[in-house]
Amino acid sequence: MLIALLFILAYLLGSIPSGLIVGKAAKGIDIREHGSGNLGATNAFRTLGVKAGSIVVAADILKGTLAAFLPAILHIGVHPLLAGVAAVIGHMFPVFAKFKGGKAVATSGGVLLCYQPLLFLTMVAVFFLFLYITKYVSLSSILTGLYTTVYSLFTKDLLLVAVVAFLTAFVVYRHRTNIKRIIDKTEPKIKWMSGKR
C-alpha cells in the first residue's frame, strides 16, 4: 500500500505543469497556445525567454530529483530510479494538464541528479556541447540521451542501464516530429547562444 502511494505521489509530483505555471506567472500566457504548444522547457524558452525558460528547466529538474529522493524521505524500500520514472511519466502525461506534457528531458536529468550526480553533470556538459555545435535543442537532447545510455553501460548497474535506455527511447519518441523537421530543415535553431536576438 505504501509503495503504491509513493508511486502515485511521484507521478503527481511529475505532473506539476511547471511551464504552464511559469508562463501564467511571468507573462500571463498559456504556453500551450504558443510556439510548439508543448509544456516543456524548449517551448518555454521559445515563448517566455531565457530567464523564465531557465526557471522552468530548474523546476522540471527538481521534480525528478525530489521524486527520486521520495523513497529515502518516506523510508520506503523502493529504488530511487523507479520512483523517478513515475515522475517522468507524470511529466509526459500530467493529470493536471489533460495528460499532455513535455518531453521529459529535464525531469529525466533530475532523476539522474539524485542517483548519479556525476552522470548528470557530464550530461549537462555534453548537452551544451551538442547545442553549441548544432543549435538544435531537440537534436542535442536526443544525442545527450544516447550518450547517457552509452555511459550507463560502463557503470555495470543493470537497473541504471535499463532505466536510462527506457527514458532515452521515450525522449527519442517524443521528439519524432522534431526529427522530421530537422530532416526537412524546418526545425528552428536557437539564437541566444550565438548572441543573436
From Swiss-Prot:
GO cellular component, as recorded: plasma membrane
InterPro entries assigned to the protein according to its UniProt record, in alphabetical order: G3P_acylTferase_PlsY
Pfam families referenced in this protein's UniProt entry, alphabetically: G3P_acyltransf
Keyword Ribosomal protein: no
Pathway: Lipid metabolism; phospholipid metabolism
The organism's place on the tree of life at top rank: Bacteria
Enzyme class label: transferase
Main location per the UniProt record: membrane
Subcellular locations according to the entry: Cell membrane
Transmembrane segments: 2-22, 69-89, 111-131, 153-173
Membrane-related topology note: Multi-pass membrane protein
GO biological process, one term: phospholipid biosynthetic process
Single GO term (MF): acyl-phosphate glycerol-3-phosphate acyltransferase activity
Enzyme Commission code(s) on record: 2.3.1.275
Keywords: Cell membrane, Lipid biosynthesis, Lipid metabolism, Membrane, Phospholipid biosynthesis, Phospholipid metabolism, Transferase, Transmembrane, Transmembrane helix
Function: Catalyzes the transfer of an acyl group from acyl-phosphate (acyl-PO(4)) to glycerol-3-phosphate (G3P) to form lysophosphatidic acid (LPA). This enzyme utilizes acyl-phosphate as fatty acyl donor, but not acyl-CoA or acyl-ACP.
Subunit structure: Probably interacts with PlsX.
Similarity comment: family membership: Belongs to the PlsY family.
PANTHER family, per the entry: GLYCEROL-3-PHOSPHATE ACYLTRANSFERASE-RELATED, INNER MEMBRANE PROTEIN YGIH
Name this polypeptide is given: Glycerol-3-phosphate acyltransferase
Gene giving rise to this polypeptide: plsY
